[in-house]
């Protein structure tokens, strides 16, 4: 094995023992998340309750919809997303905005897994599990 390849493997093994979120790791996670469902970002559509409950509730009640429970509990993030979409964007961009928020939430969860303040075993495998879920 060549010296550069051995050095690369040593660095990879070191990272695997003590994983940290670097820009490269974040970019790889984002790419893998995108490849999981590319149609969600390339041809976005509203899904399930996004349009029929949260956007309609936003249209009917405005900001008061944030405090309306649905199916027994509050859906703060979907209702905040509906409020932001309705107040900031053209209706044609609402599905893309919903999917971008979902993408950002997934990336935030993956980034949190790699936090040094969070003691978890086998962080790379946990991240892989989240990506495959």
Description of each model-found segment:
Residues 52-53, 57-58, 67-91, 96:
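Short hydrophobic/aromatic helix or loop-helix immediately within or flanking a transmembrane segment
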Residues 26-30, 75-79, 83, 99, ...:
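Alpha-helical transmembrane spans of integral membrane proteins, capturing the lipid-embedded, hydrophobic core
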Residues 33-51:
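Helix-to-loop transition at the C-terminal end of transmembrane segments
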Residues 20, 24, 43, 47, ...:
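Aromatic-acidic/polar surface patches that form glycan- and anion
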Residues 100-124:
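Transmembrane-helix motifs of polytopic, lipid-linked glycan transferases
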Residues 124-133:
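Membrane-embedded helix bundles of polyisoprenyl
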């Amino acid at each position: 094995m060549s010296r550069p390849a051995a050095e690369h493997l040593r660095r990879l093994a070191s990272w695997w023992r003590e994983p940290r979120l670097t820009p490269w790791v974040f970019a790889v996670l984002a790419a893998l998340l995108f490849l999981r469902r590319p149609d969600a970002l390339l041809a976005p559509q509203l899904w399930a309750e996004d349009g029929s409950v949260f956007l309609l509730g936003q249209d009917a009640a405005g900001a008061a919809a944030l405090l309306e429970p649905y199916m027994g509990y509050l859906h703060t993030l979907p209702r905040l997303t509906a409020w932001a979409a309705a107040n900031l964007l053209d209706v044609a961009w609402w599905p893309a905005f919903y999917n971008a928020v979902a993408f950002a939430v997934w990336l935030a969860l993956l980034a949190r897994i790699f936090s040094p303040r969070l003691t978890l075993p086998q962080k790379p495998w946990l991240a892989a599990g989240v990506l495959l879920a």
